[in-house]
Amino acid sequence: MKILFAINQLSEFVGGSLVPVEVAEYLHGMGHDCTIAANHVDEPLAPLVARQGIVVTDEIPALNAFDFDLVWLQNHTAPLLRYEPVDGSRERTLFVFAHLSGLTFHENPGLVFEPLLADVTIANSENLKRHLTQLDVPPDGIVVYPNPAPAGFWRIDPAAEPAQTPTTVQLISNHAPPEIIDALALCSQRGIDTAHIGQAGTYVRVTPEMLGADGAVVSVGKSVQYAVARGIPPYVYDRWGGPGYLTVENFERAASANFSGRCCFRKIDAQQIAEEIVEGFPAACRFLAGLPPGLLRRYRMEPYIEQLLSRIDSAPPNAARLETLIQKAPWLRRERFMALGIRDNFRGHKAGNAKIRQMRRETRKLKRRLQPG
């Protein structure tokens, strides 16, 4: 099958990009022909994806949606595609609109294309599902896709006897607040190995091998599911605060907010964070080891994707979709202008940031040359 992912950016290691990338990697591994099209394509993520044999392009308007069996859409990219019945087009295409947040315009539902085309609407949490239904997205079409982890993250034989204190504490964050950075330093003073994976630390894609046994992970969102899959207790805290280690009392509430920390907005200081990370570690390990298999299956990625594939044959015919699109043509053109504006503004934003980084590098070089001696 041919499968298309149309997203805003394929450049940074962020959840909005990594979610479709992981789905594409799985489908590509099954032998499907996958394309990821993004408004902005750049290092470091895009080359990693392209090297696997997945097609990468920044020309979304050059693509015909009806050439694909499944189209996964994010960030108001649907209006940028063409919808043309030509030789080789599919009789049916399943349209999946994925929403991974409700905080920004980019992540909220579209106005015309989405209501007309959506066969499946993805929300990454129960809270986001409620938000989408308040915006008149039909609830029976929403699938909660809780940032599940790919098979490679799941460790079959987790350590049976956890250490009394974590041997390592890994912070995974692109936006860690000061109290977390300070807490990491306090853990280091206790003799615990610490590391920061993110834009202010070591900027790499998180892999299963990075998440070793007998350690703790401090993060929110997608990395929490990674940690759960590895059998490593996640300490849920970031810029929104958070509940800390997962417990019987807070698990479902934290999950309903996608482990973002927005379940409680609890903010504490660095000293308390460090104490909780160290002192609460054994109990956090025991809680994680006791999670029932049925609950853990919720966070396995592959069954969700298989369910999507099974729905392709029941998608509406593209001929019927085309008739509906033609009837709404003036409104669709309006939304296309908006989507082009989003694309151009984002590209300009990225180009401006790149220019600023270049100027800073050149300024540092000039200062070094001008230093006496």
Residue locations for each model-derived region?
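Catalytic binding pocket for nucleotide-activated donors in carbohydrate/polymer assembly enzymes
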Residues: 222-287
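Acidic anion/phosphate-binding donor-loop and adjacent secondary structure
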Residues: 105-110, 130-134, 143-165, 205
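A short, glycine/small-residue-rich beta-strand->loop->alpha-helix junction that serves as a flexible
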Residues: 7-19, 177-179
